[in-house]
Amino acid sequence: MLTIIIILFCSWNTNSFNFSNYKKDRKQAFTNGEKLRFRIGLGFIDAGYAEFEVAPYKKNKAYYHVIGKGFSSKTVDWFFKVRDQYETIIDSSTLYPVQFIRSVEEGNASFKQHYVFNQKEQKIFDGKDTISTSKKIQDMMSCYFYARNLELKNLKKGEILTFPTFVDSEIYNLKIKFLGKENIKIRAGKFKALKFCPVVQKGRIFENE
């Protein structure tokens, strides 16, 4: 999917904290009916858009059905057309996924993925194989909604949150670093925000902060 908010990258040379160290907020940060829309800009050009919608899964309030779509603008379509869709079905009590569906169309490349999570037995079926895990696992979209519900008032600047996540049939520790609090101004107005950046492995595309 198109990169939405993440614009900063950091190295791994710092202490890491698993998200399980932080309790979930009693009041959930999202609910059925929520709709989010982001504009992705490259300078003065609207490069694309990302949309998220939360709904009950087959009218079953025990699960959230989150659908995320990422698509390039008409201008960018001429060069690199993107039409991505992500779906995650999340247990509303634990906020861990039970299913993940991904459909990607980017340029000339396209593929689909469907994962089934058995969090109780700590197993994941990716359509071909069953992968055993040592802990509960998020998918690449459910971890965002899980993170929104963490109580982070005691989070210190420089700390890193780690999210064990199943991506492309492998388990990765996705990490984000807390950069502090910041007042931001966007088209919708002024907001108090918590600032994070993703952590990337040294020796890959980005090597320095």
Give short role names for the model-derived ranges.
Residues 17-117, 155-209:
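Acidic, serine/threonine-rich low-complexity disordered tracts
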Residues 109-153:
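Hydrophobic, well-structured mid-protein blocks that either form specific transmembrane helices
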Residues 1-20:
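Bacterial Sec-dependent N-terminal signal peptides
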